[in-house]
């Protein structure tokens, strides 16, 4: 499987704070056709606020999903595979080792997105799917919330906030009252 070839099928693996997702697409238009879409809840961000590390259990769940996704992409004759990782892999003390494990398994370099890039990726998804969108795009993940302005097929200011579903759960220790305060 090669990176960057145009045309044909391609896959994207998103390694997030709560889930790992594979989406396979068929190229051919501004909005590529989705052929396959699967998400595995790995919980990489679980406990990250307190420990500063990705747990061994969550890493194993994520790596098992990635191994499976690689086989699926190869079986579907995907011509390229792109792997991105977000805030959990970016901020964890053992994030670089985890990324190295992914690269060893797949042979594909992992792009660790910063907060602005996460916001841009969400905006590109909207730009590909809607005619002349105008407004604010929000992407709520397990470890962060990204907001970005879009209009006239252009990206505006984008920000990433440390408020995701897993982070809120961890920081509030499961208390609804504490979560509301945060």
Locate each region found by the language model:
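Active-site-adjacent helix-turn-beta-strand microarchitecture at beta-sheet edges
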Residues: 142-144
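Nucleotide/phosphate-binding catalytic cleft detector across ATP-hydrolyzing
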Residues: 1-17, 23-137, 148-182
């Amino acid at each position: 499987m090669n990176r960057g070839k145009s045309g044909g099928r391609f896959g994207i693996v998103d390694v997030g704070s709560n889930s790992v997702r594979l989406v396979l697409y068929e190229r051919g238009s501004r909005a590529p056709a989705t052929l396959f879409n699967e998400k595995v809840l790995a919980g990489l961000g679980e406990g990250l606020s307190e420990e500063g590390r990705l747990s061994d259990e969550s890493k194993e769940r994520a790596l098992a999903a990635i191994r499976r996704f690689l086989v699926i992409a190869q079986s579907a004759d995907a011509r390229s595979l792109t792997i991105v990782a977000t805030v959990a892999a970016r901020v964890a003390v053992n994030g670089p080792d985890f990324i190295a494990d992914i690269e060893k398994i797949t042979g594909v370099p992992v792009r660790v997105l910063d907060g602005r890039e996460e916001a841009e990726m969400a905006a590109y998804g909207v730009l590909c799917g809607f005619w002349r969108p105008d407004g604010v795009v929000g992407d709520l993940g397990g470890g962060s919330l990204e907001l970005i302005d879009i209009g006239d097929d252009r990206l505006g200011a984008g920000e990433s906030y440390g408020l995701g579903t897993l982070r809120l759960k961890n920081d509030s220790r499961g208390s609804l009252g504490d979560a509301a305060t945060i």
